[in-house]
Design a protein with these regions (language model features):
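Non-catalytic accessory segments of DNA primases and related replication-initiation nucleases
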Residues: 1-104, 108, 113, 127
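Structured, non-catalytic alpha/beta "coupling" segments that mediate domain-domain communication
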Residues: 2-15, 127-146, 271, 281
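Residue-level signature of catalytic and energy-coupling elements of molecular machines
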Residues: 67, 199, 269
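A polyampholytic, Gly/Pro-enriched intrinsically disordered region
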Residues: 101, 228-236, 276-281
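Acidic, metal-coordinating catalytic cores used for nucleic-acid/nucleotide bond scission
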Residues: 194, 215, 235-244, 262, ...
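Arginine/glycine-rich "motif VI" loop of SF2 helicases in the C-terminal RecA-like domain
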Residues: 222, 249-256
Length: 281
């Protein structure tokens, strides 16, 4: 039973291949340790949010009620690791501390935010949670949607940039979609988290979305690893049309084949999928 480096050395020796090995610098080792620590903390948070959704009164009454209203079935909620963060300034912090997680990493991942006078608060409190996975399935960040009407709070909060989370390089749903994108040789690109989950549930699994940002060249490049065909389905309102135009300007110069689905004004992909199923595409 070989480790990966040992297997490489074994194969190289068997076939007389010269294998050049370099020693990792101390800086690279520390960087890798930090990344691993952030992945571990994000994994803890994902499990905490999921457990809160399924096993707390507030999670069931508020978080699960919202997902059920959207028509999300339990299997799709579990598949995307959806969760809920209770309306508390420090519930996640207390749980993390009780389990021995380093506060520094909670802050670096953006799960906890340091405010005035050194006070620390749970960043996603009172929100349903959409974990963001990288292509290998590791949780790199989160999106959180507020459910109560509060004009002072943004509708969505997203994890800040970190050593493991670079918004311009990642797409929501890519881990669950990558195989289907390859199989169908086509990728559906929508605007938001709920669009991805809703259409995935409707049977369109080759679907992704930017993570709270405008589409970037690096995200287009990520899709192109799996297919050269994109179908764009952005919201039918004025902002959605503007985003569509910008996305077209981003995609076509990359030499990718592009189709655009025009939704009726006031509809997003999630709304339209719930009314019409996946057949509209």
């Amino acid at each position: 039973q070989f480790s990966y480096p040992e297997a490489l050395r074994f194969i190289a020796k068997r076939y007389n291949i010269e294998l050049e090995e370099t020693q990792e610098t101390a800086e690279a080792v520390e960087e890798k340790k930090l990344e691993d620590s952030l992945y571990i903390v994000n994994q803890f948070a994902k499990e905490y949010f999921s457990n809160t959704l399924f096993n707390s009164t507030e999670g069931q009454n508020i978080g699960m009620s919202y997902f059920k209203e959207r028509g999300f079935r339990e299997n799709i909620i579990q598949k995307f690791d959806l969760g809920y963060s209770i309306e508390s300034t420090d519930a996640l912090q207390k749980e993390a501390k009780a389990k021995g997680y380093n506060e520094e990493y909670l802050i670096k991942t953006g799960l906890v935010k340091q405010v005035d006078n050194g006070i620390k608060r749970d960043f996603f409190r009172g929100r349903v949670i959409f974990p963001v996975h990288n292509v290998s399935g590791k949780v790199v960040g989160f999106g959180g949607r507020i459910l109560k009407k509060d004009e002072k709070q943004p509708k969505y909060l997203n994890s800040p940039e970190s050593e493991v989370y670079h918004k311009s390089k990642i797409l929501y749903g890519i881990f669950h979609a990558r195989q289907s994108i390859r199989t169908h040789d086509e990728c559906f690109l929508v605007e938001g988290y709920t669009d991805v989950v809703s259409l995935h549930q409707a049977g369109i699994e080759n679907i992704v979305a930017p993570c709270g940002t405008a589409l970037t060249e690096l995200q287009v490049k990520l899709i192109s690893r799996y297919t050269n065909n994109i179908v764009l389905i952005f919201d039918g309102d004025h902002a959605g049309i503007n985003a569509t135009i910008k996305a077209i300007d981003m995609i076509l110069p990359a030499g990718i084949n592009l189709k655009v689905v025009l939704l009726p004004n006031g509809n997003d992909a999630d709304d339209f999928a719930r009314k019409n199923g996946g057949s509209f595409v």
